[in-house]
Amino acid sequence: MPFSLDLTGKIALVTGGSRGIGAACVRMFRQAGASVVFNYRKAREAADALVSELGGEGCYAVQAELDGTGAEEALVRAAVDRFGALDILVLNHGIWPPHDQPIDTMTAEQWRKTLAINLDSVFALVKHGVAQMKRQGRGGHIVVVSSTAGQRGEAFHCDYAATKGAVISMVKGLSTELARDRIYVNCVAPGWVATDMTAAVLEQPETQRKILQVIPLGRPAKPEEIAAPILFLCTSHAGFITGEIFNVNGGAVLVG
């Protein structure tokens, strides 16, 4: 089989697609020939600029606040209404509270907010995305973005780590559950990535020094270095891969 990351004719939905890893995914999926719908929360200018950059046709942005309260079903429906089907679901959105928060001072509000955005919304998107894929009867691909924190924990960020560990367990269970439907379910687990979400932390010299000490490759990832394996997992070349946790973190998960 010739090696080609060709997704012509496929319809992809990418969450958190206006910036960072999500925007890199949108670009790569369009370059591979897929039609792409992505959501943004507040960054409308960035979303509009990305659609314009990619030529408009075959790329569509939707404002949606993903927290498990109903926008997820509407977002899946918007993708299907726009392009007629759903073949690929990339769940990239999420929050990482940037300030260290000891468990004894963490508020219930912070805990619930992190779980709502990082976990409840993932459940809802998978639920409605899988229902659509089953109706179509032609299989599909789901890739969830987790984190090194989901595998080894993260001190002072137990809310975030709990959600990222939970989605890893979801991926493992769903990969078996959905295999008969030819719906592949995998996970990509980044560590530190140079994005808007991490910029304030990575710009602090002492904090950056400590972070780089636990990344064997000695630097944070570029968004494109996370998007590339996500793209691969949604192609025919990954046709015997499901239920896997792809550690794309410069080796950080091994030494943290």
Language-model segments: what does each one mean?
Residues A131, T176-R180, G239:
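Alpha-helical segment proximal to the catalytic Tyr-Lys
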Residues H99-I103, T107-L115, I211:
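Substrate-binding pocket helix/loop in short-chain dehydrogenase/reductase
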Residues A32-A49:
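Conserved glycine-rich Rossmann-like NAD(P)H-binding loop of the short-chain dehydrogenase/reductase
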Residues I11, S18-R19:
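Conserved glycine-rich cofactor-binding loop
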Residues P2-F3, D100, R152, L231, ...:
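Short C-terminal tail/terminal secondary-structure segment
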Residues S147:
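Residue(s) in the substrate-gating loop at a strand-loop-helix junction
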Residues V126, T163, V171:
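Active-site helix of classical SDR
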